[in-house]
Swiss-Prot record:
Present with 538 molecules/cell in log phase SD medium. Forms a complex with ATG9 and ATG27. One of its GO terms (cellular component) is phagophore assembly site membrane. This is Autophagy-related protein 23. It comes from Saccharomyces cerevisiae (strain ATCC 204508 / S288c) (Baker's yeast). Keywords: Autophagy, Coiled coil, Cytoplasm, Membrane, Protein transport, Transport. Residues 144-213, 272-302 form a coiled coil.
Length: 453
């Protein structure tokens, strides 16, 4: 049986017991309801027995309250461990995070002087000499059309053969040097392209490894979240921060927001949920511990109440038995009033002693009801005895009822006895109580699966 079911059953018994206390007082004061007194007394005893069993079920060494507290303590420890693992994973995930590329060099970037490559342009020296020799206006750099025969004749006339040969050699040298430098630059460019291709391939490979590591971390984070969701259901916690989204909403949000923002929001929600769950578990544990302490105190109280009530019933039952025995043994079925008063007063004194030893409202009310009826009987006996001594033939205002059943009596009771509720099962000698011994044994074996009879 679950803890909530046991607590509900206890509340039902307490409510029914309160009803029985009122019926007990009415039945004792109503002569026509005398036949119901025994049944009401029996039901009160059954209720007290049930309360004792329920409290034992709750506060025993493997009781439901202690089991629930132990379960919550384990849940709290699990929550702390999950949160610790989650924080470590988030920290590790951040260490694997790749920042967006920027054009600016990082602060710790150092130029390697050995890696500096100097590019030469020796061909420009020869080329400049050639331009100076012939003049820039006499080259293709000018807008003059070389096809003009007149200009070409003038240039040839102005230049000697040696000068032209020298200029030609300058061009050859410049061309050779330029070609050599181009070859060197092309070789360097090929090396750069080769290096760049290698870098791109390595970037892909390393990026894949990094994504794999982050994916592995995300997998473990999702497992932790699943465990925390199960824990939420177990402790009855619903997060106001966690909302299920449709697939279209997730895709839409993925397009609008970056992955970093999504993970940051997820981490914030998880941290807030952790704080709320931890607070809830601690509040539940504190409440159950207070309830356990109250039930321990109630166990002692209910045991005392039951013992006092049983003592009261035994004493009253003994008195009734003695009176019935004396009535049956007397020749005229009468007992002298003085003798009867003495027997009743002895019982009243015993009940007064019981009242002095109890300050609980329940037993005080029940025992006082029994005592008050006996006190009224003594008053009537005293009145009868005084009247008899005065020679009066007046009869008592009411017959003295000692709860003896009379055959053939047609007196109808004005007191309606409530039907016995489902959680109390009364039987004959010995009475059967609501919580059976098998339920308690099953509880000790951590397999409470039966309902309270």
């Amino acid at each position: 049986m679950e803890l909530n079911q046991v607590l509900e059953k206890k509340e039902q018994i307490l409510q029914y017991l309160g009803t029985l206390v009122g019926l007990h007082e009415k039945a004792l004061s109503d002569v026509n309801s005398a036949s119901q007194v025994t049944s009401i007394r029996k039901d009160i005893t059954i209720c007290l027995n049930d309360l004792c069993r329920i409290n034992d079920l709750l506060v025993s060494h493997d009781g439901l309250l202690k089991r629930e507290i132990g379960s919550l303590l384990r849940d709290k420890q699990e929550l702390l461990e999950l949160n610790e693992r989650e924080q470590l994973l988030w920290k590790e995930r951040k260490s694997w995070h790749i920042k967006q590329e920027t054009d600016a060099a990082p602060a710790d970037y150092v130029i390697d002087k050995d890696a500096i490559i100097t590019i030469s342009s020796h061909h420009r020296t020869s080329l400049n000499k050639y331009i100076e020799s012939v003049g820039a206006e006499n080259t293709i750099l000018s807008n003059t059309d070389d096809s003009d025969a007149m200009i070409e004749e003038v240039q040839n006339a102005e230049s000697s053969a040696d000068q032209m040969i020298r200029n030609y050699k300058l061009l050859q040298l410049s061309h050779k040097q330029a070609k050599s430098e181009i070859i060197r630059l092309e070789t360097l460019l090929r090396d750069f392209k080769k290096d760049n291709k290698f870098i791109e391939e390595e970037l892909k490979r390393q990026s894949g490894r990094i994504r794999s590591e982050m994916g592995n971390i995300d997998f473990h984070l999702s497992k932790i979240e699943e465990s925390k969701h199960q824990l939420m259901k177990r402790i009855g916690f619903e997060s106001p921060l966690t909302q299920e989204k449709s697939l279209s909403e997730k895709i839409f949000n993925l397009r609008l927001s970056s992955a970093d923002e999504d993970y940051n929001e997820r981490q914030t929600i998880n941290m807030k949920n952790f704080v709320h769950m931890k607070d809830l578990i601690e509040l539940k544990i504190e409440d159950l511990q207070e309830q356990l302490m109250r039930n321990k105190n109630e166990s002692s109280t209910v045991l005392t109440q039951r013992e006092l009530w049983l003592d009261c019933q035994k004493k009253v039952g003994d008195l009734e038995s003695k009176l019935i025995t004396k009535l049956r043994s007397s020749s005229n079925s009468k007992i002298p009033p003085n003798e009867m008063s003495e027997m009743i007063n002895s019982t009243i004194q015993y009940l007064n002693n019981l009242l002095d030893s109890s300050d609980e409202k329940l037993t005080t009310t029940l025992i006082s009801n029994e005592r008050d009826v006996l006190s009224k009987a003594c008053e009537e006996l005293h009145s009868e005895s005084t009247t008899a001594q005065d020679g009066s033939s007046a009869l008592p205002s009411k017959p003295i009822d000692i709860h003896k059943s009379h055959k053939g009596s047609n007196a109808s009771s004005n007191l309606k006895q409530p039907s016995t509720p489902s959680f109390l099962v009364a039987s004959k000698s010995p009475p059967k109580i609501g919580i059976s011994e098998s339920v308690v044994n099953a509880n000790k074996n951590d397999a409470i699966s039966k309902k309270v009879e």
